[in-house]
């Protein structure tokens, strides 16, 4: 029953991180140095500035992860420089795929309300509500995520 007070933060999710995750997977398939991303990698944070791509949560390499993040961040700009505006790939990877995974209750990439910051993480909806992936993270990766959190708080 509608209470007139709007939606709770837990009822809203952004799906822009899906296309960034898909781009990271594409680069991982092209370059063997990034191959661990396909099984152990993660995408965190916003769709743009502050994005963090981790080559692996088990065998994190900060320099490699920063290189992969840069490739992912600039991929869209390179496509636009060619005269194209990418619509289909983001619609599929951020929209359709992530939405289907959400509706199935499967793990997917999405920005969710964590406290007072919207942060892109791997998550899923269960009968008990939103579940975000909880991992032990290497210190260097945790530090990057803390930097992104600070950046996002400054936007508010």
How does the language model describe each region?
Residues 26-156:
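Long, compositionally biased stretches enriched for glycine and/or charged residues
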Residues 1-35:
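Glycine-/Pro-rich loop/turn segments that contact NAD(P) or position catalytic residues
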């Amino acid at each position: 029953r509608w209470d007139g007070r709007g939606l709770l933060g837990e009822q809203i999710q952004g799906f822009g991180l899906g296309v960034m995750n898909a781009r990271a997977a594409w680069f991982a398939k092209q370059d063997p140095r990034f191959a661990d991303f396909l099984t152990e990698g993660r995408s965190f944070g916003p769709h743009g500035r502050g994005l963090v791509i981790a080559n692996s949560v088990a065998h994190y390499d900060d320099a490699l992860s920063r290189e992969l993040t840069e490739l992912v961040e600039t991929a869209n700009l390179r496509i636009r420089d060619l005269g194209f505006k990418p619509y289909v790939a983001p619609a599929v990877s951020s929209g359709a795929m992530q939405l289907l995974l959400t509706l199935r209750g499967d793990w997917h990439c999405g920005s969710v309300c964590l406290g007072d910051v919207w942060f892109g993480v791997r998550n899923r909806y269960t009968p008990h509500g939103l579940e975000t992936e909880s991992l032990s993270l290497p210190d260097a990766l945790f530090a990057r995520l803390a930097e992104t959190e600070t950046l996002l708080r400054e936007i508010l």
